[in-house]
Amino acid sequence: MMDSNRPNTYKAAVVQAASDPTSSLVSAQKAAALIEKAAGAGARLVVFPEAFIGGYPKGNSFGAPVGMRKPEGREAFRLYWEAAIDLDGVEVETIAAAAAATGAFTVIGCIEREQGTLYCTALFFDGARGLVGKHRKLMPTAGERLIWGFGDGSTMPVFETSLGNIGAVICWENYMPMLRMHMYSQGISIYCAPTADDRDTWLPTMQHIALEGRCFVLTACQHLKRGAFPADYECALGADPETVLMRGGSAIVNPLGKVLAGPCFEGETILYADIALDEVTRGKFDFDAAGHYSRPDVFQLVVDDRPKRAVSTVSAVRARN
């Protein structure tokens, strides 16, 4: 059902900035200030990069050549685990407060800690309701698999809001056709793509997804220099503090693949674009990947969205005489 309070057009923002990989609280405080800045410019939706809170450890091998785990790698993981966040912690409270104060719906990447396992997670904040959900990255890429766990099918939400149907797919998950199809089947119209991919090939990927899903795509990547990390941080890209580890490339794309803002590679910035939700419907006139262009008589996708737990406890109740 169409939301009668839905704005015809509103302003969205994509934040391209460096987080503090040594302090999640500092990163959260920076994010809160950027939410306030974007909202002050009129943005009702604000999207942040992958792993903005907790940090993306670009260039770190975690001391793990094949068949070996070095002591210094174990210590690097301990420090990374310390920088991750619990979802009932002060970092989440800080973002929730900024979203509440501004009314801006916010999507932000974090490193989520659950006991001994870390997850690359996207968090969703509604200004009125606080943290409303999360998406855990299903498939970490290459070396990420050493430090991050795998999300299951229970955290692939699309939220119906007055700003459109909002969801998130993280970095190279965007190359998983079946995941994209699942998002399209949920009617996603605001497709958020937090990422660490700053290559020239990323923008065409985002344009393809916008065209394929007939949705707005908002992709956010950090602009991060080596100097954000301590001098003794192990980095395959060297020790020069001015070396750019991630160069951004954030962008906003409309449902017909037109780039509305970005890409920007020059430094930290906030990109803005007007989101006209009627363009989603206009786009689906001739292509609806999960609807009239889907051919379910030939192809079908089965999605298991049940949570998968390593241990399930069944407790016996002793009968009373």
UniProtKB/Swiss-Prot annotation:
Keyword Transcription included in the entry's annotation: no
Keywords noted in UniProt: Hydrolase
EC number in record: 3.5.5.7
Organism for this UniProt entry: Bradyrhizobium diazoefficiens (strain JCM 10833 / BCRC 13528 / IAM 13628 / NBRC 14792 / USDA 110)
Name of this protein: Nitrilase blr3397
pH dependence (record): Optimum pH is 7.0-8-0.
Assigned protein family: Belongs to the carbon-nitrogen hydrolase superfamily. Nitrilase family.
Pfam entry (one): CN_hydrolase
